[in-house]
A protein has these predicted regions:
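Helix-rich "cap/lid" substructures immediately adjacent to catalytic or cofactor-binding pockets
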Residues: 2, 8-111, 187
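An amphipathic alpha-helix/helix-turn recognition signal
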Residues: 51, 85, 114-115, 127, ...
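Alpha/beta catalytic cores of group-transfer enzymes, especially the acyltransferase/condensing modules
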Residues: 31-33, 60, 123-204
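Gly/Ala-rich beta-loop-alpha elbow adjacent to hydrolase catalytic centers
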Residues: 90, 108-116, 120, 128
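Short, conserved glycine- and acidic-residue-centered signature motifs
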Residues: 83, 116, 190
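Short, glycine/charge-rich beta-strand/loop segments that flank catalytic centers
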Residues: 73-74, 109-115, 140, 152-156
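A short acidic, glycine/proline-enriched capping/turn motif at secondary-structure boundaries
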Residues: 93, 117-118, 141-142
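Alpha-helix C-terminal capping segments
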Residues: 96, 100, 121-126
């Protein structure tokens, strides 16, 4: 791996240098939140955001930035590429917000939705950008390989809870994956089982 730069330390230190705001939190997104072209305006406008993308390219030893900005979309959506792309674009957003003064107070909390937890760790100074990019790329590759061996999918179920929810997924091969909110859960499993669970949920 290339020698670590001071970029991630610089981002965390700039955050810590701002006044702490107990009412402020940052939540970083997970997989599924990316599209071709996302972050290009930040890359063009803010040197610190550009450095985030360029550093990710160096760590991965392939032009992630070009894939993010030009696609093709199908290749970007592969889990092996989508995960480092989302991490990088999210950190570029943070860098731009610090550089242009939009983020002037230190959040009391930083968190992430699934993959976004890695971004939060970098923002908090607990993990370097380089290590995060490397870990997330490996994570994405392993998840991609697993999904190719045994195809699966996920679905959000809205408005069901308690016994009604139990009846949708119990014994079906579908598992509860995330509690997004009191009224929304995510289920996952084999494609056919998730499709059947989604059908049952729509009937309720």
């Amino acid at each position: 791996m290339p020698q670590a730069s001071a970029l991630s330390t610089h981002l965390a230190e700039r955050l810590r240098a701002t006044p702490r705001d107990a009412s402020l939190a940052i939540l970083f997104p997970g997989q599924g939140s990316h599209q071709v072209g996302a972050g290009r305006d930040l890359f063009d406008a803010f040197p610190l955001a550009r450095e985030v993308f360029e550093r990710a390219d160096q760590v991965l030893r392939f032009p992630l930035t070009k894939l993010c900005f030009e696609g093709p979309d199908e290749e970007l959506r592969d889990t092996a590429n989508a995960q480092p792309a989302i991490l990088t674009a999210s950190l570029a957003c943070l860098a731009a917000a610090l550089e242009n003064g939009a983020l002037r107070r230190q959040p009391a909390f930083m968190a992430g939705h699934s993959l976004g937890e890695f971004t939060a760790l970098v923002a908090a100074g607990a993990l370097s950008l380089e290590d995060a990019v490397s870990l997330v790329a490996t994570r994405g590759r392993l998840m991609q390989e697993a999904s190719e061996r045994q195809p699966g999918t996920m679905a959000a179920i809205i408005g069901l809870n308690g016994e009604a929810l139990d009846e949708v997924y119990r014994g079906s091969g579908v598992e509860l994956c995330n509690y997004n909110s009191p009224s929304q859960v995510v289920v996952g499993g084999p494609v056919a089982a998730v499709e059947e669970a989604s059908r049952l949920a729509k009937e309720r």
